């Protein structure tokens, strides 16, 4: 397994196993929605009313509809910062703040 996929594979696998609905944003801005049916090194098979093969190089962001728990294969059972919400660069659901702060 490539080092760059040590986070990607467990994350996608958790989404697939738990059948979590996801929004996948492509680099051209298009939003796709569905459940991850399967994936490999290059593509994700996204199922909604039809199955779509989405090339990973075209994906900008994968946003689960709910938090998922995914653990790496490290002895400590390390987790990513994504589902803890303490990584400011991680994709998150947009939250609207009131305009009173200005």
UniProtKB/Swiss-Prot annotation:
This protein's UniProt keywords: RNA-binding, Stress response
Q: Which CDD domains does the UniProt record give?
A: Hfq
Against InterPro entries, the record matches this protein to: Hfq, LSM_dom_sf, Sm
A single cellular component GO annotation: cytosol
GO BP annotations of the record are:
regulation of DNA-templated transcription; regulation of RNA stability; regulation of translation, ncRNA-mediated
- Please list the residue ranges that the record marks as compositionally biased, kind Polar residues: 70-96
Q: Where is this region: Disordered?
A: 64-102
Q: Which domain of life is it from?
A: Bacteria
Q: What exactly does this protein do?
A: RNA chaperone that binds small regulatory RNA (sRNAs) and mRNAs to facilitate mRNA translational regulation in response to envelope stress, environmental stress and changes in metabolite concentrations. Also binds with high specificity to tRNAs.
- What is this protein's name? RNA-binding protein Hfq
Q: Which organism is it from?
A: Serratia proteamaculans (strain 568)
């Amino acid at each position: 397994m490539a080092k760059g996929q040590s986070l990607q594979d467990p994350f996608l696998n958790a989404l697939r196993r738990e059948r979590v609905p996801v929004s996948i944003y492509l680099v051209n801005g298009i939003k796709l929605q569905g459940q991850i049916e399967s994936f490999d090194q290059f593509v994700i098979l996204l199922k909604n009313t039809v199955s779509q093969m989405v090339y990973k190089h075209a994906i900008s962001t994968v946003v689960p509809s709910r938090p998922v728990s995914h653990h790496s294969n490290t002895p400590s059972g390390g987790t990513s910062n994504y589902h803890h919400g303490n990584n400011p660069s991680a994709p998150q659901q947009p939250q609207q703040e009131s305009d009173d702060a200005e």
